[in-house]
Amino acid sequence: MDLQEKLKLLPEKPGVYLMKDEEGNIIYVGKASVLKNRVRQYFQNTDNHPPKVKVMLSHVEDFEYIVTDTELEALMLECNLIKKYKPKYNVLLKDDKNYPYIKITVAEDYPRIMFTRKIDMDGSKYFGPYGSAFAVRETIKLVRKMFPIRTCNVNIEKSLGKVRECLYYHIGLCSAPCTGRIEKEEYRKLVDQAVMFLEGKREWLVEKLKEEMQKAADELRFEEAARLRDQIFAIEKISEKQKVTSINEDEQDVISMARSDDIAHIEVFFVREGKLSGREHYYMKNTEGMGREEIISSFIKQFYESSPSVPKEIIIDVELEEKDLLEDWLSQKRGNRVSITVPLRGKKKELVDMVYQNAVEALKNEILAREKILKDPAVLELSNLLGIEYPKRIEAYDISNVRGEDNVGSMVVFVDGKPKKSEYRKFTIKYVEGQDDYQSMREMIERRFLHALEEKKQIEEGTLSKEKAKFIEMPDLILVDGGIGHVNAALEVIEKLGISVPVYGMVKDSRHRTRGLVGVSGEVQMPVTGRAFRLVAQIQEEAHRFAITFHRERQSKRFKTDLLNIKGIGEKRAKVLYEAFGSIEEIKKASLEELKKVKGMNERSAKAVYEYFHGEV
């Protein structure tokens, strides 16, 4: 059936329509209060359509429609279908599936706080979405400082009293429920307080904590009262830094937008209890030829469709054609009335103007950043092969030992495809006995990131300057020397620490040359003549060189220490012996005559060395 015949069959009912190209791909999704009128408009007076619509129509070969009972149902279905198909010609919230959230697993007996990019129907509380992973991690850290709740997946019931406190307990970021140091009811109080804090109920939370502090003091529980006092101080200190808006005591999200030719930057201020509790920014794509009203409307649909919470009021700076419909949809999601306001004067107008100015500044910075960034072609090729964001900082790890002796690890750093030797780090493996590369890799990775966490804490407390920190910079990509076992070992550690970084293994062929990369989804096909392959080979060689050099230094030091125990052998003779034979094993194998021939050795010293290893001649 051709398009004209299908147009005649369109019903006079609300619903959703899906435009398709010649391959059957859905390239646009829209809703209509009357399908017959809306869809026909596309194919009438086509000369009057905006350029983007004309381009879309040139690819339309077919369409489908779904009838709904109400326009509100059509709106909800439209949101779901746009999220599912991400049509080429719809205005889209850029990479919306990747925006991060804070998750608190309140359905568990001992809830955890964690970073996530996925909302599951598991009874957990979700906060977000946030504009960046960094913002989520910093917020989680802030919450844990005030309300030390766990991030690990330890089975509390099985481990209770059987394990010792981890580092997070000692740096004040966990109350160690796994050890029984805190009662279940007290731990749940911490979780409830963290939830209130993230919900923006800070004044109410402070009042409740003050009541608990007074009660603890009256009952002579002074240590508990002091802890509550510190919590109150921390919350009030944060609140002092927030702008007082003086609108009212309800919840508002304030939204505005700035745009250039190919970028639409959305700025959102979150106002809770009359104070600015947070701000985030987002980008919309496929906005060419679209009006401000359409972009803001699309953002509201996509943002709140995936958001776990909806405020009482949304303040914007442009009138929306479907305002009433959006209010009904948002009210249904929230469970009570939500209003969308476009203020013309007063405090709300001042606030939305301020949000707009922030959007303009952020857009300027984004444009400047794009102009300044000259991405390395090899790194760019690698990011495309792996399907990840451009990894400006790549860290590579290698383990080196001989039959488990002098076990060491190395970390080399490449920034924009170039080695940054000042960032290289060495690790002496301390807690692994024998030759266990997987466990050695776990230890090295864990120590590296625990150092980073500790340094960030010290910087915040003012006891360490950022310039003196050695591990503060976080990687965008981790490469480990080895296969999937090494990859899993590294992933196990960073996931336990709540860190989100892609990890790949650098695998070698039978001739011990770089073959490519392997990840959790399998081996990555890399053209051996490509820039990315040559970069990976260079990184693998550098990681190996740095590890083996450190291993030999450790080995040499140990060998010299052994030789210095021999009467008549000093630093000088120990050095020439090591240079002549290369290892302690070869020195042990050497005959008396071979030892005598070494420059600087005489019969007495040679005999002393020989007898040290073989007994008297």
UniProtKB/Swiss-Prot annotation:
It comes from Caldanaerobacter subterraneus subsp. tengcongensis (strain DSM 15242 / JCM 11007 / NBRC 100824 / MB4). The UvrABC repair system catalyzes the recognition and processing of DNA lesions. UvrC both incises the 5' and 3' sides of the lesion. The N-terminal half is responsible for the 3' incision and the C-terminal half is responsible for the 5' incision. GO terms for molecular function: DNA binding; excinuclease ABC activity. This is UvrABC system protein C. Interacts with UvrB in an incision complex. Residues 12-91 form the GIY-YIG domain. Its main location: cytoplasm. It is found in: Cytoplasm. It comes from the Bacteria. GO terms for biological process: nucleotide-excision repair; SOS response. Belongs to the UvrC family. Pfam families: GIY-YIG (PF01541), HHH_5 (PF14520), UVR (PF02151), UvrC_RNaseH (PF22920), UvrC_RNaseH_dom (PF08459). Keywords: Cytoplasm, DNA damage, DNA excision, DNA repair, Excision nuclease, SOS response. GO terms for cellular component: cytoplasm; excinuclease repair complex. SUPFAM superfamilies: C-terminal UvrC-binding domain of UvrB, GIY-YIG endonuclease, RuvA domain 2-like. Residues 203-238 form the UVR domain.
